[in-house]
């Protein structure tokens, strides 16, 4: 093996990289690499694991070409050897020793844990048509973890209650199933956790910890996109827990089919139940406003609550922001709440009740999102039951929400005006008796106007 002084080419590369990445990244990913052999034809490197090798090539391949020998294809002539971590033979550990090992790694891993928010519980989650289904699913899996809907995949826009439900599941299980091991973590924290254990050469300890869980709660899985190496480890953990009938709950801003992840992990996420959290309707927004106001000791009359909810309709966080602003104004200036006060204090948050012009394309995108179908399929000619229904709802909403003629609407869908008319009559007839369809149509409307 060459000494460090002999590794001049590699040292030059290291000095170059140090100036182009953070100290943490260098220590985590570059510093652990050791030179085993260096010749004019190639360099042999020892890496602690395959993640480090892939990181080096994914991020510094072009730079490596300027320093290290190249092969006949113009690629860096590097040979990688993954270090072997030999363990002395030992008798099989007892259950007590095994638990102690898991407890030890828990102490290392808990720094990455997302603490459950004490305010996020089922009993203070305001229910409405846009979230009724997903809340019922969350309550169901919290009551019987691992029995059904596994994994539960919750998706929806920012500030609509995904994290609230995730933490509510954690609280319920912790209180009603005290013997179960629970871990709540953001995707970014999972990645940082893995980096930490890669650096300390203790990935096996991390694997043992995660695979000893009874309930894994993962927030914002969309941040796993474009992180292929970490995605593989997450997928392995995911599969192990599912195969052991351990419950997993995941949140995301998109349904699995729209995430830029491998087909393998997308298929796994769709194994259980995929549930959408929609934009709350007016009545639900009013209920949320009044609940948040009550928590702050602020009394909002119904008329005023409806007025605010009619002008703030993006998400729950905006409603919370409005309450915080009104509470601060009343306390700081010692004034009571009036319509003028509301209008002046919240004017920067208000949006006009007459939303921006709605187009057929807007309607198609919203319906595709709500029904979790591809936009091209919705515009196409597929006669599958789900697509036909979604397409008819889109036509019905186009006729209801925009002023274009049936001919123009039909042209936008690539259909005749008679097809649009038939679709509208079909949906209107079904709406008279089908409560599920009513909820679906309202969900689409909320998504469009929100």
Curated annotation (Swiss-Prot):
Stretches for region Domain II: 87-114
Entry superkingdom: Bacteria
Region described as Domain IV, binds dsDNA: spans on this chain: 331-450
BP term (GO), one: DNA replication initiation
PROSITE patterns: DNAA
Pfam families: Bac_DnaA (PF00308), Bac_DnaA_C (PF08299), DnaA_N (PF11638)
Region spans: Domain III, AAA+ region: 115-330
Sequence segments annotated as region (Domain I, interacts with DnaA modulators): 1-87
Binding site for ATP: 159, 161-163
GO molecular function: ATP binding; ATP hydrolysis activity; DNA replication origin binding; lipid binding
SUPFAM superfamilies with a match to the protein in the record: P-loop containing nucleoside triphosphate hydrolases, TrpR-like
Locations listed in the record: Cytoplasm
Keywords, ordered alphabetically: ATP-binding, Cytoplasm, DNA replication, DNA-binding, Lipid-binding, Nucleotide-binding
Example of a GO cellular component annotation carried by this entry: plasma membrane
Entry-linked PANTHER family: CHROMOSOMAL REPLICATION INITIATOR PROTEIN DNAA
NCBIfam families listed in its UniProt record: DnaA (TIGR00362)
Entry similarity comment: Belongs to the DnaA family.
Domain free text: Domain I is involved in oligomerization and binding regulators, domain II is flexibile and of varying length in different bacteria, domain III forms the AAA+ region, while domain IV binds dsDNA.
Task performed by this protein: Plays an essential role in the initiation and regulation of chromosomal replication. ATP-DnaA binds to the origin of replication (oriC) to initiate formation of the DNA replication initiation complex once per cell cycle. Binds the DnaA box (a 9 base pair repeat at the origin) and separates the double-stranded (ds)DNA. Forms a right-handed helical filament on oriC DNA; dsDNA binds to the exterior of the filament while single-stranded (ss)DNA is stabiized in the filament's interior.
The protein's assembly and partners: Oligomerizes as a right-handed, spiral filament on DNA at oriC.
Protein's name according to its UniProt entry: Chromosomal replication initiator protein DnaA 2
Species of provenance: Chlamydia pneumoniae
Gene: dnaA2
